């Protein structure tokens, strides 16, 4: 298995698909990376030379924010919103949907399992 950005990527898959196993790289960025490096789209990971793996690794380190750094930045952005006390920060703090979805019904994923209320059923 090739190890890129701290992630073991599967060797049997095509390079474009395998790169999407890295947090922060989707299909669009994976296409960009292999075009920059000059690897054919149909090439599989186990067919890559060490030099090509090194080029991919350097390109990702230089041009993209992935894995731990990306997760840290996302959590810091959410923490900043909560510290500001803005509406979005309050919604994050309370564990409710942030982007205007209804909560009277639905929103179970964000709110967690339903809590039983005593005397509610008749």
From Swiss-Prot:
Record keywords: Ribonucleoprotein, Ribosomal protein, RNA-binding, rRNA-binding, tRNA-binding
Signal peptide from the UniProt entry: none
Residue span of region Disordered: 99-122
A biological process term (GO) from this entry: translation
Keyword Ribosomal protein appears in the UniProt entry: yes
GO CC terms: cytosol; small ribosomal subunit
Gene3D superfamilies to which the protein is assigned, alphabetical: 1.10.8.50, 30s ribosomal protein s13, domain 2
Superkingdom, natural source: Bacteria
Any Pfam family matching the protein: Ribosomal_S13
Subunit and partners: Part of the 30S ribosomal subunit. Forms a loose heterodimer with protein S19. Forms two bridges to the 50S subunit in the 70S ribosome.
Family under the similarity heading: Belongs to the universal ribosomal protein uS13 family.
Protein name, as recorded: Small ribosomal subunit protein uS13
């Amino acid at each position: 298995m090739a190890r890129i950005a701290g992630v073991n990527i599967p060797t049997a898959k095509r390079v474009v698909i395998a790169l999407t196993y890295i947090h922060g790289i989707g299909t669009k960025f994976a296409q960009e990376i292999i075009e920059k490096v000059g690897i054919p789209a149909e090439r599989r990971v186990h067919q890559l030379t060490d030099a090509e793996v090194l080029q991919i690794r350097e390109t990702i380190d230089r041009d993209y924010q992935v894995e731990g750094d990306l997760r840290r930045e996302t959590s810091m952005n959410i923490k900043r919103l909560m510290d500001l006390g803005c509406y979005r920060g309050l919604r994050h703090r309370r564990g409710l949907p942030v982007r205007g979805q209804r909560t009277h019904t639905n929103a179970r994923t964000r709110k967690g399992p339903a809590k039983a209320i005593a005397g509610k059923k008749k």
